[in-house]
Amino acid sequence: KPLNGEVIANVQGKNHKGVGYLPQQTQAQKDFPASVWEVVLSGVLNNDHRCPFYNKKDKAEAEKNMEKLNILDLKKRCYRELSGGQQQRVLLARALCATDSVLILDEPVTGLDPAASMELYETIKDLNKKENVTIIMVSHDIKNALNYATHILHLEQEKDFFGTVEEYKKSNVSNMFLGGVAND
């Protein structure tokens, strides 16, 4: 049961981009009847976009993020015709259009096959390491997420934990949750 709270972002300057968000996939999203281009481009609307039309800068940003995620060749395809992994890459490109610093990912690999999951984890790792994007990920896929994380925030009743992956693997919380698997 959620309690309450707030998130305060360190927003600096007029041109600061906000936080990008990749929601957990729903059936409604999977059936969305827009082109890949339209979905990705809609991400710039989070950036204090007051004009009802997209400008050259918006389009260049969308194209850059599509290239970064290797989906430029899908530009004209209908979003709902894509595989689950491709759809997640499209939504990740859209989220990147909204930020250059922080991404919040909600269960990003849910519903993906193992190969697509690992590919998405590698993409997320590259965004963090090469693009210096902070990643905050909510996941039940702890065993795989541990391989890509630097820190873990585990919230469970009165067994909360925050620390490095190594500290987590040695903790009682990890042993209870993973049955010692993380310590192998």
Predicted regions and their residues:
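Conserved ABC transporter NBD signature motif
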Residues: P2-V19
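Conserved ABC ATPase "signature" region
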Residues: K56-L74
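Conserved ABC ATPase signature
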Residues: C78-L82, Q86
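Catalytic Walker B motif of ABC-type/P-loop ATPase nucleotide-binding domains
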Residues: L103-D106
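Helix N-cap at the start of a conserved alpha-helix in ABC-type nucleotide-binding domains
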Residues: P114-A116
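H-loop/switch region of ABC-family ATPase nucleotide-binding domains
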Residues: S139-H140
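H-loop (His-switch) and adjacent beta-strand-loop-beta switch element
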Residues: I152-V165
